[in-house]
Design a protein with these regions (language model features):
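N-terminal secretory signal peptides and thylakoid transit peptides that target proteins
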Residues: 1-19
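Feature marks hydrolase-like catalytic cores characterized by long aromatic- and Gly/Pro-rich stretches
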Residues: 54-55, 66-87, 244-257, 261-383
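Beta-strand elements within well-structured catalytic alpha/beta cores of enzymes
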Residues: 36-47, 89, 233-239, 267, ...
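Anion-binding catalytic surfaces of enzymes that hydrolyze or transfer phosphate/sulfate esters
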Residues: 178-273
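Intrinsic-disorder/low-complexity recognition with aromatic hotspots
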Residues: 16-84, 88, 93-95
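Extracytoplasmic mature domains of secreted/periplasmic and thylakoid-lumen proteins
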Residues: 32, 81-179
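Loop/turn elements at helix/coil->beta-strand transitions in domains of secreted/extracellular proteins
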Residues: 34-38, 95-99, 144-146, 230-234, ...
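Solvent-exposed loop/turn segments at secondary-structure junctions
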Residues: 44-48, 105-109, 154-157, 241-244, ...
Length: 383
């Protein structure tokens, strides 16, 4: 039989999933057990921070956006509001269990989905410079053996250590085709990967209906898994379709508003699933870039830079809107079109890692983000 030129990574990409769990505490891990869990909601396409958290106190907002400002926004303070899709998140803000970071993002300004998504997961200094992800590297430093919910391991969770499946993964074909595929690939890679495909073959015979598919149920499922003492320490849920170049809408029934409602449902699902473990949890959103400040000619927005980040969890004990607001006047925008990112979102991620995994800030910024000068903003979020 001829050898098939199929790498393990290519095989792993053959199975799609929306939820990933990783980072299992070491057996007998007690005194030095990491104090919390960290969950990431990846928002692919570029979430519009000005729609999600409208700065209604900025006089230039209404000049730039005549059709995209939600009328019934939820007031946070004298300057910022929340999109009406965030009913649950708003309640967490009122209970001091959620915060917003605004005018923030990763230091990437080229507006490419592929490059931006790679950087938000890899956390490298340039696109495609890393084969591991920032959360995976953090789990490595915390010495937690990773386990993944799916064969399709996202870059964000990849570390130097091997990741095994925590739950059965599904290859979306018939059982016969699935078995034939595994046997074919296993034979082609008999020397270098027999143990890998033995694991895959065993898991392929398990029931595939265990894991729910809707985002809220996935979050609840992940929360329950992380609430167990021997369960995973981290999870990732992906939500796409934020690339609203046309007919974006302004209220909860618009295209962007419907995606924001999914975020709200995911956070609610996490809280329900985590139960008492909510008190040691932190949830954060990631997006590759924001949207243009000025709406375009098709009632939408184009690729931008700065956006907003949402944080939730019992680890937060005081709700805040954390922002060094740059302004929306054209002279204040990046290249006269984008909200400037004044807070490096890697600092936000570093603070969440520090809290959840108990790692030192200097170690995180050096070994996870390769930027020793990255500011520490832990106290702004968690004190």
């Amino acid at each position: 039989m001829p050898k098939i030129n199929l790498t393990r990574r290519q095989f792993l990409k053959a199975s799609g999933a929306s939820l990933f769990l990783a980072g299992l505490p070491l057996p007998g891990f007690t005194k030095d057990e990491p104090p919390g869990t960290i969950s990431v909601i990846m928002l692919e396409g570029g979430m519009d921070g000005l729609t999600a958290v409208p700065p209604f106190g900025d006089p230039d907002l209404s000049k730039m956006r005549k059709n995209l400002i939600p009328d019934n926004y939820l007031k946070l303070n004298s300057f910022f509001g929340l999109h009406p899709s965030f009913q649950y998140f708003s309640g967490l803000m009122a209970k001091n269990n959620a915060s917003v970071i605004h005018a923030t993002n990763f230091p990437y300004t080229k507006r490419s989905h592929f490059e931006g998504q790679n950087l938000m997961q890899g956390g490298g200094l340039s696109p495609f410079s890393e084969t591991t992800g920032w959360l995976g590297r953090a789990l490595d430093l915390a010495k937690t053996p990773g386990r993944s919910m799916s064969l399709d391991m996202p870059l964000l969770l990849r570390g130097a250590h091997e990741n095994d499946n925590f739950f059965p993964a599904s290859i979306r074909n018939s059982g016969t085709l699935k078995t034939d595929l595994i046997n074919m690939i296993s034979n082609a890679h008999a020397q270098e990967s027999s143990s890998i495909f033995t694991k895959v073959s065993k898991k392929s015979t398990q029931k595939e209906s265990v894991v729910p598919r809707d985002p809220a149920s996935l979050a609840k499922y992940a929360g329950k898994a992380m609430s167990i003492k021997s369960g995973p320490l981290s999870s990732v849920i992906k939500v796409d379709q934020f690339d609203t170049h046309s007919n974006q809408g302004s209220d909860e029934y618009g295209r962007h508003g419907e995606r924001l409602a999914i975020i709200d449902d995911i956070i609610a699902g996490y809280k329900e699933g985590l139960g008492d473990a909510w008190d040691r949890s932190i949830i954060l959103t990631l997006t590759e870039f924001g949207r243009t400040v000025k709406e375009n000619g098709t009632w939408g927005t184009d690729h931008g830079w700065g956006s907003a980040g949402l944080l939730a969890g019992g680890a937060i004990n005081k709700s805040r809107v954390i922002s060094n607001w740059p302004g929306l006047a054209e002279r204040d925008l990046f290249e006269k079109r984008d909200l400037i990112s004044t807070i490096d979102y890697r600092s936000v991620c570093a603070a969440c890692i520090e809290h959840a995994l108990g790692l030192d800030h200097d170690l995180i910024v050096d070994k996870v983000f390769f930027t020793p000068s990255l500011p520490r903003i832990y106290d702004y979020i968690f004190s």
